[in-house]
Amino acid sequence: LHVQMTREDNSYLQMLKQRAFINGLDLCGFSTHQGFVSPDVAVRQKNIDHTLHCLELAYKLGIPTMRVNTGRWGTTKNFDTLMENKGIEPRLEGHSDDQGFKWVIDSFEKCLKKAEELGVMMGLENHWGLGRTAEGVLRIVKAIDSPWLQVTADTGNFLEDQYRQFEMLAPQTVYVQAKT
């Protein structure tokens, strides 16, 4: 998980690779956080830049997939409240889900060239925000229609009708995060 890394210099990255190798572990998925659901162009650009940077880190670590997400409206400040509401939160006043999907799609499209150049596949996780449902994840992935943005399926994140939703995601799933 990127947020748990204490440093990002090359010697640290190579030490992580060495530790994984010595312990028989494959580094197969790099986990990051994005927040593209914002009317503020500067906020989206900051998250695009962060995503591009994380693609570079994944590449240096030899990791072929990187978990990405949409972000969320940010109108629910308390995580427990967000969970009580099953990840659903009110939109920012004056904005629509359609606008949010457009912002997310535009942002991921700006990351595709770097993902392809580095050979790191982005996997959009079924996480909170606009990726809370299989329909939301697939709306984004299918709109972009690139082999460099597919799906990371997280078994702990669908709160309703899990099997149907995983069945929908399966054809485009490149990575699974399994939880009990």
Predicted features and spans:
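Glycine-/small-residue-rich active-site loops that bind phosphorylated ligands and cofactors
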Residues: 8, 129, 157-158
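N-terminal, post-signal-peptide region of Sec/Tat-exported proteins
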Residues: 1-14
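Gly/Pro-rich active-site loop or hairpin
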Residues: 134-138, 142, 148, 157-180
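Active-site acidic/histidine proton-transfer and metal-coordination neighborhood
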Residues: 13-14, 19-26, 37-150
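Hydrophobic faces of well-ordered beta-strands that scaffold small-molecule active sites
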Residues: 1, 27-32, 66-68, 122-124, ...
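Short, solvent-exposed loop/turn segments at secondary-structure boundaries
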Residues: 5-8, 39-44, 164
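Active-site pre-Tyr helix/loop in NAD(P)-dependent dehydrogenases
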Residues: 33, 72, 158
